[in-house]
Amino acid sequence: MEEVIKRSSRKNPVENQILVIFGSNGDLAKRKLLPAIFQLYLDDLLPERFAVIGAGSQEKSEDVNRLDIANSMLEFAKTGAEENPDKLQSFLEHVYYQQVNNQSEEDFGLLKTYIEHLSATLDIPKNIIYYFSIPPFLYETVAAHLIKYGLNAEEDGWKRIIIEKPFGYSYDTAVELDKNLRSGFNEDQIYRIDHYLGKETVQNIMVTRFSNGFFEPIWNRKYVDRVEITASEKIGVGTRGGYYDSSGTMRDMIQNHLLQVLAVVAMEPPSIFDSESIRNESVKVLQALRPIKPSEISQNVVRGQYIETMVDEAIQKGYRQEKGVAPNSRTETFIAMKVFVDNWRWGDIPFYIRTGKCLPDHVTEVVIHLKPAPHQLFKQRCVAQSTNMIILRISPDAGVAIDFGMKIPGAGYKVQNVNMAFHYSDLAENKISEAYERLLLDCMIGDSTLYARIDAVKASWKFVDPILQEWKKNPDIPLYFYECNTWGPKEANALFGNKELKWRAPFKKFKTD
């Protein structure tokens, strides 16, 4: 498998192309997309001839647009903007602007004319990526306008669209969105981006499992007791209150990010390491998720909402005090749930998923708890020893750690757990790419491995939809409140069904964990 991974990772050629960003004046474009493209440029990963067209509603000249982007690079680019002013200037020469009202059909006719002009002037083939950095309710409108003017046609070059989550608001709306997109774009033209899958350390879960002979043989129900997946955020909803109150944690985090991480952790080895084989195996996991019946929701899902709390001698707002949030909102900002994957590898092994806002630290990790040795020879001699763990830290301070028992030096046989860890920061010569850098480059070369396929989207919605519907229908299902800077409602520990078990509380700095 290791050789297969090495062969498949050889760099594909990046063809000359045009990238159109709808919503180019928005936060996502300024903070993430344009800095990522600039970093690819600094790393010499972009083709010789390329153009980036910002498509925004504001009226402004090319010069003003380039000045705006230069300021964004200086503020948000990781490296390079201040250190390489000449590089920044040469990058800006590839950036253009066209005023587009996304709801105006005529503006897309003008966009088509502008693309044709740039293609001819710059000698760039009509290989085009359309990035939908816009509110989801505009996806179908923009796609329809592109189709109307033939901007989806591939006779003169390939065309691809990238859409951000959420991919629908429910199973039915996801199916409807796909139907409308597919009226003019094939599945292999649609790239559904999930930036979690673009994280280097999420991708490394597959390499950790499938290229190491001492991990994969124990990655199953015979040796694994349980799996924990945590994605905690220290901040509240901030300025996203209006969006969040209609979405909630289940739609914002569980349905996409964390179920995708679960799929990577639980999937079978693909026969070959290519896009379709990997996605075939990951979707099988999502399709094997055991449905949670309405009568089982309270025992398997805990939802919470943060409340006003005094933190470090300052009052931190509760969720209901956030701007755009209803004063009696029952929207969840925390979820902990127990999930089962009903297949041969994982039958009856619980996966515990936890995510929330206003928690003590911003941490994302996967913890594989192994079963104890069949005979506890040193049970009476242990000093705070727990079962063995494999900890896959996704962020921050990314790395992998193995937690196991060792004898304390000195007389007798006292045993305690120690940590053997690898940290990505130790690879000083290798920079960890930002998720959007990797994902944009993958789309440019036509690699959809790390993008969500429609069957995976449908499978994840099919799993969470009944829970959301029951919450809406049944007000008696509890919504627990928790203080900011805590690990959520204490009721989340009841999911383990064992008073001796509780959620792992990770440190922000993995090296002290």
Language-model segments: which ranges?
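Secretory/organelle targeting and membrane-embedding segments
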Residues: 1-163, 167-513
